[in-house]
Amino acid sequence: MWKTIFVNLFSFTILTVSANAELWWRSGTKDNPSYFSKAGITVSPTTDLTPYSNYATPDGENYFVLDQNITVQMFRSLWQSSNQHISMTDGSVLTIDTAPNGKDGYFSTIALRGIESFGQNSMIFESGTVNIVNSARDTYNMSADIRLNENSSGANNKILTFESGTTLNSELSLFFFGANNSEYPERSVVNLNGALNTSVSTDGVVKYNSITLKGDDNNSIIVNFGETATANIGKTNIEKNSVLNIAKGANVSVNTKNSGIASENPNIQVDTNAVLNVNGNLKISATASTHAMNINGTVNVGKDASVYIKDGGYRNVQVFRGGTFDISSTGKDSVYVDDGFRLIGGKLVLRSEEALASTIIWLYSNGGTSTIDLYAAAHAKAFSFTDGSKLVVNFNEGGSLWLDEFTVERGDNGWANNLDEKAMLTLVNYSNYLLHVDSFRAEDDLSRIFAEGFEEGSFRWEADTVNGGYWLVGTAVPEPAAVASVLGAFAFALAAYRRLK
């Protein structure tokens, strides 16, 4: 039978909790926090430990100090509106072990249970180490849930924070659950300002377990890596309506080597209506035959950010129909995608000049028409077209495109190559001298380039006598007024000729 035990840790009682039980740990104030050791309590790994907010605290701020190592089955707040501050002293470690659940599956490890009528419910780990483990991993296949969605039918906010002095280690895959109402997308927030590590070592082989931001039509969660955060994690899934933010100064490494993820899978998946905002540093180290990123939602790369994809796997980014990859980072090769961007009906937005300087842009046909929006004098390595691919390039104010090569051949059998009769390039808001190449291939069929205001089949390369290389230029279609003027002059001349006869 499950039991609930309420403990006032100022009472100096001696208590052993050895059966399945929920232990309520009553709070203290900032000047007089509640120390776990004062009660002389020992707990079994089957215990749920619950910081309990004491309404006697005048400001709603509740303080707990864990000053001994303990292992519990779950750590969760009650339903009050309060801020619960948890710190650990003398190297104390909180271990959350899912093994007592005794079966395969997904199990709550940290949970915020506040209900709507109590407003905000937050838990703040200010220092120390939290380990999430499965001590019976040879017997049970388990994953760990971090839940901010319990008792959350309304608009109450739930915030879980790990400050810069904390470390969260998980030997299990982590699932972050937000509140079950996407009308309030910012009310379920996890702030990770310290270290997050999901590695596990087996016989000397290290692998990193996955993290997933759970979301759907009715659920959403925001996970923030703060400016002091470091993360070493495995496959990362950002599901619908969820947001992952990487702040300036944060360092996030996604490593799927030894992870066993299936071939052709991505290392980072951004679903429809999901968002990844990168303002810090993101590095992806992939296992063989996997894609670095699959984008069905939105990725924004800020001006101080870097994205580095060079180590293992296919080393590419795939942007599908409905997906957008928006780049503002200013450093040369600050978005380094070793094996290129694949536009499969998706959109690439370039707001900086050199971020993609060494990257090839592949065009695929199976996603429909792909798009590039230019807002700067953007530099990339080359295009590579596949049969049936269509690309629209929008030249917005200040936008131009500079390529090392117009096209390159990709693959052993040349399945992606030059612009030919099976592909199409459309230029929007184009003027002559906005597309520059250092070199081009004779095989490129420039008659497959179309732009409003230019005669079809008129595009050609013109030598750039200042910078070297070549400009793409075409013959403009005469303006209607000019055409009318020419016709008028012709008619006048014809009439004069007839009079002379």
Where are the regions that the model predicts?
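Glycine-rich repeat segments that build the extracellular carbohydrate-interaction surface of secreted
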Residues: 43, 48-74, 87-89, 95-98, ...
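Bacterial N-terminal signal peptides
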Residues: 7-16
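Bacterial N-terminal signal peptides that target proteins for export
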Residues: 1-6, 497
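Membrane-interface capping segments at transmembrane-helix boundaries
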Residues: 499-501
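Extracellular/surface-exposed low-complexity segments
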Residues: 21-58, 374, 394-477
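The right-handed parallel beta-helix/beta-solenoid scaffold, focusing on the short coil/turn
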Residues: 61-62, 68-70, 76, 82-84, ...
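A short, hydrophobic C-terminal helix/tail in secreted or cell-surface proteins
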Residues: 479-497
